[in-house]
Amino acid sequence: MPSDILVVAALGRPFTLGMLYDARNDKLIPGFTLWEDEVIEESTLESSQPSSAFEIIASDSTDDKSSLMDIEASLKASFLGGLVEVGGSAKYLNNQKKFKNQSRVTLQYKATTSFKQLMTNLGTKHVEYSELFENIQATHVVIGILYGANAFFVFDSNKVDSTNVQEIQGQMEAVIKKIPSVEISGKASVQLTGEETDITNSFSCEFHGDFFLTTNPTTFEDAVKTYQQLPQMMGKDNAVPMTVWLVPMVNFYSEAPQLMADSSTPILRKVRNTLEAIVQVQMRCNDALDDPTVNLFTEVQKKLSDFQKICDDHMSKLQATIAKKLFAIRSGDEDESALLNLFEENLQSPFNIESLNMWMEFEEREINVLRSCMDILTKAKPKVIFNQGVLFKGLYDSKVKHALCYVFTNVTKNDVFLNVLNEFLDSPQSRPKKLRPSPKDYWYSYDDIPETMREKAYLFRNLAKEMNNRCVHFFVTAIHNPKQEGAGIHYYRESIQIIDEFTKPYMPGVESIKDRRELQWYDCELTLDPETAHQVLTLSEGNKKAVSGNTKSPTDHLEKFSHFQQVMCTKGLSGRHYWELEWSGYVGAGVTYKGIGRKTSTSDSSLGKNEKSWLFEYSTKSGYQQIHNSKKTRVTVSSTGFKLLGVYLDWPAGTLSFYMVNKAWVTHLHTFHTKFNEAVYPAFLIGDAQQKVNGQIKLL
């Protein structure tokens, strides 16, 4: 080992002939040589060595990258241990995929130009000794350099579904293989088929090279143009050191430090595997951080960011220790068991790779549970607010009579195992509280809680579908509450929380309802249908208001009432619905099947005078009456001439109820009991030409 000539990759480092090098930590020692510049120049032989080649790989492993750059195992270990700072094209070694679920293909262009070497018979006769010479920690001298240049075009897809990574990678590789033979037209545009263009538009390009470019390529088309120009850019003056030959210093100075030993291949493989496994965990963490669900839950985002930082810190400490051990082994102060012990200690720590991957599995499960719930909830189109200040501002809105809030109650930024990792980083000699995350510390590791959360999400969605109105607002948020497992549907009435496990609105019997808010659960916004309105009715305010008494030219429409001064609403209703209207004059409000007559002057076309319609009517002459199938019954009202009428349709129960509305309270007036067979349309009678009375209504 001490007398062996070393051959190492330059990796963008500024090697020159005669330069000193410490192979124990793979460091250049600039500013010192064994010979004067004139002697080196006179003793240098140069031979032409032109070559060029390209290679394509679809791997991101350190081994494959090192193979492209002709890096041997010992130097690779130094790089992984952080001993070597690379430059130029070798920065490609530091370029790692951000996401695990990402396709990558790399194109390498490699060229050599010349080989320079110092004459082997130079010996020690021209060595310039000095007082500083004895203190220089160099093990080798540079005696040969192969010049040339490397260029790497790194093509990355966007983050994709894990099942598509290989397929997309294959498509990318097939197109990139064509780069060396792609033709460029006179307009310098790349000639590709339509399908190939679609593929290339979906990925990005990053360039690492020993060539000076005014701008680096970022797209496939840029990469093709740059690749075509590289051979013309290659020349003697543009070449950089690529491979370096080193002679031990002891050949010139017997007291020089020596490279006594190096780690065996199995140990170096452990270095690589351990560090690459941590990188894989970090990519997995990046995948999670990029998930849209994580962007919603700041607590989950915080945990993942903390975990990522912890892994970074652990990696840095591990690399620093590996660097020290490599130097000690190469200096002969320790044997390779020192590195072996380091990895054994790592296996017995909470930072063993199995534990790190287990934590990520738990966190990915949490994200999957949250995503599955959000997929259900978003179909209800709720306001998703994870800032509690903004949430309560929304709850205090005067328009919000009722609010249902789906609350994730177990989402928290606190994590027992992250605390263990942090404590071990601070005190690596201490005994860790646990070596791996425990399922009992994670609520989502049990099936029953996520299942209940999804059941509540479906309930919430169905409630939103049933009560999609102005008075009931729906929110989604996260409020940590260990006493409520998984999630709850919290009910707020006029900003006050009433219950935290809501299932359905409390509705008294229709005759006993007194609180207006109970009816507003089923608030329904209606619009009058101008195509049904009798010709003397004038609609305004967005077809919310109708007034009788105006004469206008008759129009013939199949849906229009020709004899009775009536108008219907645009949509048929089933389910539960409540609406309010201001009314005055001679008016009636009710519902009808769509098939009510329109053109006759008989009862078939008159609201309340047939089996198809139900009407609550008011006139100053007759007072209040309920009418169905021509049967009239007077209704006693405590406040004659009230202005605000409420109507509640419970289609499934077969009831249609009318209420006098007074601010926060309602007074029951009458309820029709029947069995509805089809959707009903709110409809109104407004004025009577024969009695020469007018009326008006306004939907609220």
Curated annotation (Swiss-Prot):
Subcellular localization(s) per the UniProt record: Secreted
Cellular component, GO annotation: extracellular region
Tissue-specificity statement: Expressed by the venom gland.
Cleavable signal peptide: none
GO BP: any one term: killing of cells of another organism
One MF term in the entry's GO annotations: potassium channel regulator activity
SUPFAM superfamilies (alphabetical): Concanavalin A-like lectins/glucanases
Domain B30.2/SPRY, chain residue ranges per copy: 506-700
Positions of region (Structural FAT domain): 265-384
Disulfide bond sites: none
Region (Thioredoxin (THX) domain): 385-514
Region spans: Structural MACPF/CDC pore-forming domain: 2-264
UniProt keyword annotation of Transferase present: no
Chief subcellular location: secreted
One Pfam family named in its UniProt record: SPRY
UniProt domain comment: The first domain (residues 2-265) is structurally homologous to the membrane attack complex-ferforin/cholesterol-dependent cytolysin (MACPF/CDC) pore-forming domain. It makes numerous contacts with the FAT domain and comprise essentially the core pore-forming machinery.
Family recorded in the similarity comment: Belongs to the SNTX/VTX toxin family.
Subunit and interaction comment: Heterodimer of alpha and beta subunits; non-covalently linked.
Record-given protein name: Stonustoxin subunit beta
Organism (species): Synanceia horrida
Taxonomic lineage from the root: Eukaryota, Metazoa, Chordata, Craniata, Vertebrata
